[in-house]
Amino acid sequence: MGEVKKLSLGGWVFYLRGEESCLDRHKCGKWMHFFNNKEFAVHICEEAVSNGICVEAKHADADEGVCCFYLNSDDIEGHKRVLSYFIENDLIRKTKTGKLYNISFKLDDQTRAGEYGTEFHSEIKLEHFVDLNTGEFL
């Protein structure tokens, strides 16, 4: 377990390990989890960074909101670590039939460009790594 620095800034709480410089401005993005329990958000963000799942995470500084787990888009092993963590901790919602929702990885460039809702299209999705029916890695 690595030491984690916690920083509150602009409505967000960041969790950092001092390795953020490896994140490339145009390749960096995040897998997201929407929460309604701030204590849980604190726990999963801190744990993910401390255990090397990702080098940076953040959550909204509110009782509900979003957690973001950061990595570079071309870091295939990093995607697998984060998604494995999501699956192990039941962070991906399921449909009524038990199938995992096909969540998306969002580049920070897309966020900076204001791509939200129907304007947002991801090239990296859960289905590229995991069978949505079984939750097993491909």
Where are these regions (language model features)?
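Structured alpha/beta or helical-core interaction and ligand-binding surfaces enriched in interleaved
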Residues: M1-L138
